[in-house]
């Protein structure tokens, strides 16, 4: 289930601020052990260490190159596969990261960190069930990690097990009450359940702790938009885009706000770019439908709304807009059917239109 509201993912990475301290100790221990255990593999170890330096510097292509050299020298180097997976993930190569984590686990089936990292890659490649399986595999070792609980919550959200997600985020914050990712993601969960006050409390707390948390900026923008404060909302999503200029959800959300502010010519290229980056985002298809609706091109609008429906029928107000287009095309029965489906989803606008037009 995708959303206009963004869940911020926590990653176990190399010295970037998100990785649990225990993993840092593991990596350093593994490196020292590796260096001490075999002079024959010293060259591979040197490439591995160079890769770690580049990973810390966020030079992901260079890190990948060094890790690949290490693997060439020592094909069963599980740590190098794991860290190359991290670098690939950071470089937006999800499938490549998944393959590297799996290879690390083929070499060392007890490599808990690789299970944790693969859980994220599986989640990001559309396999929340596989993600949960990996997380359960390392539950004993990581259950008292706030980062583990955030990942578990994110996975439960994708599996639409929302009460379990709530429990995981709550546990993450019990373990570390200033965990910005946990606050951001629990706030997103509250928003999805229309619990707007606790959503705002979590999001504002996250931004107090980290004013540059792009997901929290985006989510606060949408809370303000929900109240109709579109101009103020625009300033926050623009801040999010300054931090992540290519993020497709942020691009779409800015386009949506520009439509609400009657600036369609500015909105159109943004929603197009959003869909180029993620064609499976139902919210972006709805935004494009709203653009065409404003241009009085009902057929194009309906096409986009129907695509959104196939991708995620839970998109807010989707059936209200489908009904409006069908009514404009003279299809009263289809309009009433759409509004009835919106009523089942507790869409206030659909409920109102059905009462006015169909009952």
Whereabouts are the PLM-identified features?
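Bacterial signal peptide processing site
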Residues: 38-40
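Alpha-helical segment of the N-proximal tetratricopeptide repeat
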Residues: 42-73, 86, 90, 120, ...
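Helix-start (N-cap) detector for alpha-helical repeat units in TPR-like alpha-solenoids
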Residues: 43-45, 78-79, 112-113, 145-147, ...
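Canonical tetratricopeptide repeat
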Residues: 49, 83, 90, 117, ...
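Structural signature of tandem alpha-helical TPR/SEL1-like repeats
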Residues: 57-66, 91-103, 125-137, 159-171, ...
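Structural marker of alpha-solenoid helical repeat scaffolds
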Residues: 73, 107, 141-142, 175, ...
């Amino acid at each position: 289930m995708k959303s206009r509201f963004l869940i911020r993912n926590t990653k176990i990475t190399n010295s970037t601020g998100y990785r649990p301290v225990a993993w840092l100790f593991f990596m350093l221990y593994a490196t020292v052990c590796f260096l001490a255990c075999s002079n024959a593999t010293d060259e591979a170890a040197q490439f591995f260490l160079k890769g770690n330096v580049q990973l810390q510097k966020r030079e992901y292509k260079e890190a990948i190159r060094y890790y690949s050299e290490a693997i060439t020298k020592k094909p069963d180097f599980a740590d190098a596969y794991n860290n190359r997976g991290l670098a690939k993930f950071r470089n937006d190569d999800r499938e490549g990261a998944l393959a590297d984590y799996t290879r690390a686990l083929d070499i060392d089936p007890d490599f808990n960190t690789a299970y944790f990292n693969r859980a994220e890659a599986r989640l990001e490649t559309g396999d929340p069930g596989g993600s949960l399986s990996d997380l359960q595999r390392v539950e004993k070792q990581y259950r008292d990690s706030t980062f583990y609980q955030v990942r578990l919550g994110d996975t439960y959200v994708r599996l639409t097990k929302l009460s379990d997600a709530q429990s995981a985020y709550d546990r993450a914050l019990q373990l570390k009450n200033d965990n910005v990712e946990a606050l951001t993601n629990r706030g997103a969960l509250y928003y999805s359940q229309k619990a707007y006050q606790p959503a705002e409390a979590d999001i504002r707390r996250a931004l107090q702790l980290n004013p540059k948390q792009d997901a929290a900026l985006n989510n606060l923008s949408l809370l303000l938009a929900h109240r109709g404060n579109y101009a103020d909302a625009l300033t926050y999503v623009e801040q999010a885009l300054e931090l992540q200029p290519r993020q497709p959800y942020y691009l779409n959300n800015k386009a949506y706000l520009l439509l609400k502010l009657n600036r369609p010519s500015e909105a159109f290229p943004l929603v197009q770019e959003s869909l180029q980056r993620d064609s499976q985002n139902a919210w972006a298809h709805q935004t494009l439908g709203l653009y065409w609706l404003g241009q009085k091109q009902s057929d194009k609008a309906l096409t986009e709304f129907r695509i959104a429906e196939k991708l995620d029928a839970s998109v807010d107000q989707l059936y209200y807009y489908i009904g409006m287009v069908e009514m404009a095309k003279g299809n009263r029965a289809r309009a009433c059917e759409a509004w009835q489906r919106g009523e089942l989803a507790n869409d206030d606008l659909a409920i109102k239109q059905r009462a006015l037009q169909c009952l």
